[in-house]
UniProtKB/Swiss-Prot annotation:
Gene that encodes it: prmB
Protein name, as recorded: Ribosomal protein uL3 glutamine methyltransferase
GO molecular function: nucleic acid binding; protein-glutamine N-methyltransferase activity
EC main group: transferase
Transit peptide found in the keyword field: no
Gene Ontology annotations for the cellular component aspect, listed alphabetically: cytosol
InterPro entries: DNA_methylase_N6_adenine_CS, HemK-like, Ribosome_uL3_MTase, SAM-dependent_MTases_sf, Small_mtfrase_dom
Any one GO BP annotation for this protein: methylation
Species for this entry: Shigella dysenteriae serotype 1 (strain Sd197)
Signal peptide: none
Function: Specifically methylates large ribosomal subunit protein uL3 on 'Gln-150'.
Family: Belongs to the protein N5-glutamine methyltransferase family. PrmB subfamily.
């Protein structure tokens, strides 16, 4: 977008609605990739324009006719240009993302929240757990969104938020503090289970890196802005998942459950471990590649993952 084009937008567009319409047009024309919390240009525009004005996403419709100042228009136009030209996800431009109805701070130290596990949390893992969990582990916590959402869903529970990345934990700690949950959610630095005490969890939830080498090489440019540490997991995408499967049983209570997301790498997992009774979960709001195993099932399958035990 050249300077004349930018000046035209700033000079002629006047209202929030104008900026939303213009952003939708720019996104549609640029054929950008949607995959960081939206799947269409309108939602993408809403999540860029309104946070850029420090407004909530659900403003009254009549407020969209409010006129904007020159500095507000410049801010929006600049971010739209960066979204189109640099393919930066909107969440990194606004430092805002949403998960389970809660707002989170994000930047390029963490992945943008988008896991279908959010639907399970909203439903309080109905049909998957036998009792209210008192101790929950969020492994590979990243921004802390899953851990924090679990703390809202189960306010009596203690939630441990584990990650190997100090950068990710810094973001998680910021979100924990902003949500007022410093007594409920405990950030812990650990290489998966390796540095954890032998705590017995009622529920382990994990969205580890699971992108295989082939998919990593073909990712849309938007994903290049995310930390590779949070995406890549070896040739078949299961490098970390195998370690989780080899160790999780030691950290689960007798009636505990493991919920793990592996995305497209579910194909490799099913092919390589046909005797493991993975329960593949279905979602009303889209998404797949999330399985459940009980402690009993993990113990029965332990021989398959013995070499990955810490």
């Amino acid at each position: 977008m050249d300077k004349i084009f930018v000046d035209e937008a700033v000079n002629e567009l006047q209202t929030i609605q104008d900026m939303l319409r213009w952003s939708v047009s720019r996104f549609s024309a640029a054929n950008i990739w949607y995959g960081h919390g939206t799947d269409n240009p309108w939602d993408e525009a809403v999540q860029l324009v309104l946070p850029s004005l420090y407004l909530p996403l659900d403003i009254p419709e009549d407020m969209r006719t409010a006129r904007l100042t020159s500095s507000e228009k410049h801010r929006i136009v600049e971010r739209v240009i960066r979204r189109v030209n640099e393919r930066i996800p909107v969440a990194y431009l606004t430092n805002k993302a949403w998960f389970c109805g809660h707002e989170f701070y994000v930047d390029e130290r963490v992945l943008v929240p988008r896991s279908p596990i959010g639907e399970l949390i909203n439903n309080k893992f109905a049909g998957l757990i036998s009792k209210q969990p008192q101790h929950i582990l969020d492994m590979c916590t990243g921004s802390g969104c899953i851990a924090i959402a679990c703390a809202y869903a189960f306010p009596e529970a203690e939630v441990d938020a584990v990650d190997i990345s100090p950068d990710a934990l810094a973001v998680a700690e910021q979100n924990i503090e902003e949500h007022g949950l410093i007594h409920n959610v405990i950030p812990i630095r650990s290489d998966l289970f390796r540095d954890l005490p032998k705590v017995q969890y009622d529920l382990i939830v994990t969205n580890p890196p699971y992108v295989d080498a082939e998919d990593m090489s073909d990712l849309p440019n938007e994903y290049r802005h995310e930390p590779e540490l949070g995406l890549a997991s070896g040739t078949d995408g299961l490098k970390l998942t195998r370690r989780i499967l080899g160790n999780a049983a030691d950290y689960l209570a007798d009636d505990g459950v493991l919920i793990c997301e592996v995305g497209n790498s579910m194909v490799h997992l099913m092919e390589q471990y046909p005797d493991v009774p993975f329960t593949w979960l279905e979602f009303d709001n889209g998404g797949d590649g999330v399985f459940m195993l009980t402690k009993e099932q993990l113990l029965a399958a332990r021989e398959h993952f013995a070499i990955y035990k810490d």
